[in-house]
């Protein structure tokens, strides 16, 4: 139809549909239409990382083989017809069929058939499930100010000046750095102040802040942000006409050495490092980029990986462009370079398409925090993305912009039972660090970060399963399938793996000034099941809806199913081994197993070293270094 191709299929009254990629605020599509288009829209109703794949509870799935925009009408126009349209004249599609009788079997079969065509999801390294900190430590200048709204580790208030000056550090302001060391190569244009008093503005100081406040931290991106560049050597210097690359290359090497120094310090404290990517991956390509305006924006990604030791990469619209095939090629290039080190890559990106799951975890984009809407719309977004072929998804803790102590704490509670969680610092109305606040929020933030660290055996086993099985974050119909759980009635709760039911606090129902509240409309499935309040031990019969569930500020509504076996570690702040400099690292020889006895149950714990990857780029074959399964009864 006028350069459009339309697939029309009959639908049944009791048929439900899922997929379509990252459809913000939505997970179930019956009676609605969704856009399969990269809208780069990060809020409710928008689309980021679309995917031309959907599946039905009737046991079929469809993947359109296209990079053209589309619209999928799941009975909005006609309740008896599913009409999926793409803006191209050629119709090309893969059809998947499941003969399983239950919806869990259908979901697993159809997702695996989708993976057969597009590739299995990447398995994240262990550290990627811990909190990440991202900011730009090459770009900004600071001054102490009573009118500032940023409190740093010394307890004083500052205001930032670099962004307002076009990402040039103003003269005589306190300069941010990675290691509290100013540039030494081609540094004539660098006018910021670096001395013994400026350590508080360094990336190292943030690692120290987590250590001093006993807060878990797994990875760190010290250059996340537009205008940040990849160092301060060669600050706003460029090659003169006819000049060779000798001076340029010495600047790149100096910046890589500075990054290597930070990586060494970070790893000594149990923290892995990574980089944000704005432009190209080599110095030659960087100089050709339209955004290039100085040697500080040059990079050599191979050296950053193999000399400086970075293992993580975050990209956004500055690099993946309009998305579609460009996004796939971008994350593939980054993944392959990271994988060349033998370490398992962490790639966080957006604006993806079918196949994105091979190389990247979905990041939902830039949003404003400090409001309940931020948590609310993310819950169904995570559920929906997990049903759409990429089980790895994450977002910023309390957004990149704005900020609120209460929302930060409630968001951390929610994200404890998700995959990746990012402190996106440097852009909001306050510092995005879990310890830059007051009690009770500091203690609660610590409690949940430590709980996630302890639950890593359970989380990591679920991550292994998600590579070729059901996702970690599961819609409630995968626990109990009926019209109620297929609908939006359960869109604000989910199963995390087989055993945890998570019902985040996502609105002010009847909160006091601190944030103590209640949670309504919690559905506990299974009339023969018993659900146990994880924090109090109180038991609830399944097959009911709970209202006025007590949710004081410290408490996430969290239930564990009777009969569950939960493997855990002892308290730790990162997954690296305990050393003299990493006293709160992980001792994997010391375990905790929580039993909730009911009948005969068992648990298969899956482990590997959490970091290794042997990768054949030509065949896309991945070996995660061997794994061990422990059967617990």
PLM regions: where:
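Aromatic- and carboxylate-enriched substrate-binding clefts and catalytic-loop regions
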Residues: 1-8, 12-15, 22, 216-445, ...
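Catalytic and substrate-binding clefts that recognize carbohydrates or anionic sugar/phosphate headgroups
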Residues: 1-185, 189-193, 207-212, 549-570
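Short alpha-helical segments and helix-capping/turn motifs at coil-helix boundaries
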Residues: 32-41, 46-51, 110-117, 202-208, ...
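Alpha-helical packing segments of well-folded alpha/beta enzyme cores
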Residues: 110, 199-206, 262, 301, ...
């Amino acid at each position: 139809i006028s350069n459009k191709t339309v697939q029309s299929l009959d639908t049944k009254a009791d048929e439900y549909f899922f997929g379509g990629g990252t459809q913000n605020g939505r997970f179930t599509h019956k009676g609605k239409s969704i856009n399969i288009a990269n809208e780069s829209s990060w809020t409710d109703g928008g689309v980021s990382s679309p995917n031309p794949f959907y599946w039905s509870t009737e046991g079929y799935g469809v993947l359109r083989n296209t990079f053209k925009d589309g619209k999928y009408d799941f009975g909005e126009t006609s309740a008896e017809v599913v009409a999926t349209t793409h803006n191209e004249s050629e119709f090309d599609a893969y059809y998947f069929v499941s003969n399983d009788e239950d919806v869990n079997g259908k979901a697993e079969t159809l997702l695996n058939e989708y993976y057969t065509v597009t590739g299995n999801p990447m398995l994240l390294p262990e550290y990627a499930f811990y909190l990440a900190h991202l900011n730009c430590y090459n770009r900004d200048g600071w001054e102490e100010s009573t009118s500032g709204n940023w409190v740093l580790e010394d307890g004083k208030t500052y205001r930032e000046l670099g962004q307002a000056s076009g990402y040039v550090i103003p003269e005589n302001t306190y300069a941010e750095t990675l290691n509290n060391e100013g540039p030494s190569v081609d540094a004539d244009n660098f006018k910021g102040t670096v001395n013994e008093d400026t350590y508080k503005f360094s990336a190292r100081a943030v690692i120290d802040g987590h250590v001093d406040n006993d807060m878990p931290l797994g990875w760190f991106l010290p250059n996340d942000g537009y205008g940040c560049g990849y160092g301060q050597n060669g600050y706003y210097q460029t090659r003169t006409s006819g000049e060779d690359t000798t001076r340029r290359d010495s600047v790149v090497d100096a910046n890589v050495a500075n990054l290597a120094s930070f990586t060494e310090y970070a790893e000594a404290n149990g923290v892995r490092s990574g980089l944000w990517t704005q432009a190209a991956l080599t110095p030659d390509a960087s100089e050709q980029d339209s955004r290039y305006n100085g040697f500080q924006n040059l990079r050599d990604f191979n050296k950053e990986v193999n000399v400086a030791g970075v293992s993580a990469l975050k990209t956004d619209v500055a690099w993946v462009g309009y998305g579609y095939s460009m996004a796939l090629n971008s994350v593939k290039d980054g993944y392959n370079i990271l994988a060349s080190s033998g370490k398992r890559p962490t790639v966080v990106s957006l604006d993806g398409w079918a196949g994105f799951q091979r190389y990247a975890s979905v990041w939902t984009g830039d949003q404003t925090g400090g409001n309940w809407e931020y948590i609310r719309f993310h819950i169904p977004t995570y559920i929906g993305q997990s049903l759409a072929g990429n089980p790895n998804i994450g977002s910023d803790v309390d957004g990149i912009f704005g900020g609120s102590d209460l929302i930060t704490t409630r968001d951390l509670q929610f994200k404890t039972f998700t995959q990746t969680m990012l402190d996106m610092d440097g852009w909001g109305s306050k510092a995005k660090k879990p310890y830059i606040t007051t009690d009770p929020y500091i203690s609660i933030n610590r409690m949940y970060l430590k709980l996630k660290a302890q639950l890593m055996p359970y989380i990591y086993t679920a991550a292994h399963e998600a590579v070729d099985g059901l996702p970690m974050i599961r819609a409630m119909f995968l626990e109990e399938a009926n019209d109620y759980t297929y609908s939006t009635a359960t869109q604000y709760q989910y199963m995390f793996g087989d055993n945890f039911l998570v019902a985040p606090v996502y609105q002010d129902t009847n909160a006091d000034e601190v944030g103590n509240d209640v949670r309504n409309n919690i559905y506990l499935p299974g009339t023969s099941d018993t659900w146990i309040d994880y924090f109090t031990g109180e038991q609830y019969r399944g097959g009911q809806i709970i209202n006025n569930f007590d949710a004081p500020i410290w408490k996430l509504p969290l239930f564990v199913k009777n009969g569950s076996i939960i493997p855990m570690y002892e308290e730790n702040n990162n997954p690296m081994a305990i050393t003299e400099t990493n006293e709160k690292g992980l001792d994997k020889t010391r375990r905790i197993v929580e039993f909730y006895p009911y009948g005969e149950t068992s648990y298969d714990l899956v482990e590997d070293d959490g970091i290794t990857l042997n990768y054949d780029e030509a065949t896309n074959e991945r070996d995660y270094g061997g794994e061990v399964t422990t059967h617990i009864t």
